[in-house]
Amino acid sequence: CKSAETPTEERIAEETPTKEKIAEETPTGETPTEEMEAGDANHKVQSSKFNVQSKVAGQTIVMLKNTHQAHVMIGTQAYDVNDDRRMPLYLLNNMLGGPGMNAKLNLALREHNGLVYTVESTMVAYGDTGTWSIYFGCDEHDVKRCLRLVRKELDKFMQKPLSDAQLKAAKKQIKGQIGVACDNRENFALDFGKSFLHYGWEKNVDRLYEQVDEITAAQIQAVAQELFDKNRLTTLIFK
């Protein structure tokens, strides 16, 4: 059994993609165009708990994998299980790329334009940090167009708060999804177990409904403005 090797700062620096490396891996030999970039490659996202900085925040990284279609992931560091902003992100994520057919990204990329078969957004909260990301697969020649459409949907949440009707509908939908999910006893048990490990008490579905009801449009917009900042997002493209 080999012992785990702790990466040195020099090794981390060597393995971190640079703009020159990205340019080499881009078919044109140039850095991605402004249309494809998520933001300033020099921008860094810092964890408030561990003083960890992301060296790829704001970059678009293209990896040539000779795949049948392009696989694209856009993401950033998000919130841990104890962060008050987690619940607004929970609702926002469901509206943007949740399992519902009316999810904004599904409508924009699949239903209205037929560019993808699968598109989804995901949030994961850990004990000390969290992640939020978007994934979609499309034909290679449609990547730029898909990225523009994704950016357009993100900007909508950043620029304008939800109306009372939109917020009410979103809450009603996610509470319905929670109710249906409770019928899956295995996932229900696992979820309750995680809650007990993190908080020391079992999850209460009625309390979860109350937390959803407490979410405001202003909270959702604030989370969108923080996480959807193009200088914060990293884009990874396999094609």
Predicted regions and their residues:
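M16 family metallopeptidases and their MPP-like homologs
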Residues: V72-Y79, N106, R110-Q159, D164-E214, ...
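Short amphipathic C-terminal alpha-helix that caps PH/PH-like domains
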Residues: C1, L92, V150-L154
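His/Glu-based metal-binding/catalytic segments typifying zinc-dependent metallopeptidases
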Residues: E9-E10, E14, E24, G29, ...
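Low-complexity, intrinsically disordered Gly/Pro/Thr-rich segments
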Residues: T216-Q225
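Long, charged low-complexity polyampholyte tracts
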Residues: Y90, Q225, L236-I237
